[in-house]
Design a protein with these regions (language model features):
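Low-complexity, serine/threonine/proline-enriched polar segments
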Residues: 146-190
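Beta-rich interaction/scaffold domains
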Residues: 19-127
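Extracellular-facing segments of soluble proteins and assemblies that are Gly/Ser/Thr-biased and enriched
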Residues: 199-285
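Short carbohydrate-recognition loop motifs
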Residues: 184-203
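Extracellular carbohydrate-recognition regions
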Residues: 119-165
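Extracellular carbohydrate recognition and processing domains
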Residues: 284-329
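Bacterial Sec-dependent N-terminal signal peptides
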Residues: 1-30
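Short structured motifs
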Residues: 50-51, 231-235, 305-308
Length: 329
């Protein structure tokens, strides 16, 4: 009896072990996405293997940080090395501002060569909230604006940032419609932008950040700093080459049913929204305003901001026009 049990157990172990095999190495060779400090937008044509990377007009083309998203296990290498290439920084200061890169699959059997071109661009002057950046594995919306260049004008490109990456840490939603910043189809014309204040759940309570307000801004969101210093996690600004006169648009607004502060309900108080644009001076490219000083910094030279009286609750699309007022001399 005992012998039969032992034999059965041995045969079962052998059967299980025979099913365990090494997983096949990935055979994909492609570039799925590209980001970087100056990158506003990356247009990838998978058929022609051509990538246009739009950066702001004042970017240093001899030192472009490019972070490529590749299939699992794949590697990438510039076909010709430049003396200025250091780690993920590449030199695109040649006349065509383009170079070729080859991706090799994890199994080493497949390669794909891409022509990558860096295109200097300016900020758009109108924003429509019509387009979302396709991003594999990202469930929240990332807005961008794109106006192709002509023979006489450079391209106009901007990628919007938001606090959505920080809200993802809460685990409160796995659907794009549950995020504080999202696209909606019933905008003033076509699509629009919806900003909502959301509960951060038990995760937010643990770090004493009980709510997350929807926001949208030009700049970047520093996810690594989101928990320890959330105000400084929002980095505002991009180089701009004109003198703005006014900020115009349309809004609707509905205040939340309750107003909370540090997790406690505050009676007889209502939340409000803010719309503003600032123009500020920076002595070096690395200098950026953040959430702690975006309205108070001495570097601000002009500001357009909606007044508290004008930021009213309304179910109808309401026009606003905010003139830029000079600041700090």
């Amino acid at each position: 009896m005992n012998f039969k049990k032992w034999t059965t157990a041995l045969m079962l172990a052998l059967a299980v072990s025979s099913c365990i095999q090494d997983e096949a190495l990935n055979s994909e060779a492609a570039i799925d996405a590209c980001t970087g400090a100056d990158v506003q937008l990356a247009h990838i044509n998978s058929d022609s293997k051509e990538i246009n990377i739009y950066v702001h007009k004042g970017a240093n083309l001899a030192k472009q940080q490019l972070l490529f998203t590749l299939p699992d296990g794949a590697t990438i290498k510039a076909d010709e090395h430049s003396p200025n290439d250091i780690l993920n920084n590449y030199d695109f200061s040649n006349e065509s501002h383009s170079r070729t890169f080859t991706v090799t699959s994890e199994d080493g059997e497949w390669t794909a060569t891409y022509t990558v071109k860096v295109v200097p661009a300016e900020m758009p002057e109108t924003f429509h909230f019509e387009d979302l950046l396709p991003s594999a594995g990202t469930e929240y919306d990332i807005f961008y604006e794109f106006e192709p260049g002509t023979s006489t004008n450079v391209s106009r490109v901007a990628q919007w940032s938001s606090g959505n990456p920080g809200y993802k840490l809460t685990g409160m939603t796995d659907n794009r419609t549950g995020y504080p910043t999202q696209q909606v189809t019933d905008g003033y014309r076509g699509n629009g932008l919806k900003l909502t204040t959301c509960d951060t759940g038990s995760f937010g309570a643990m770090v004493q950040m009980y709510i997350a307000a929807g926001n949208l801004f030009i700049g970047s969101f520093d996810l690594a700093n989101a928990l320890k210093d959330p105000l400084r996690a929002t980095k505002f600004g991009i180089q701009y080459y004109k003198r703005p006169i006014a900020l115009k648009g349309y809004f609707k607004f509905k205040a939340g049913e309750v107003y909370t502060d540090e997790g406690e309900v505050q009676k007889d108080m209502k939340d409000r929204f803010d719309i503003y644009a600032i123009l500020y001076e920076a002595n070096e490219n690395s200098f950026m305003l953040d959430g702690s000083n975006s309205l108070t910094s001495e570097n601000i030279v002009a500001k357009a901001q909606i007044s508290e009286e004008a930021a009213v609750e309304t179910d109808e699309w309401t026009a606003f026009e905010l003139p830029f007022e000079p600041m700090n001399g």
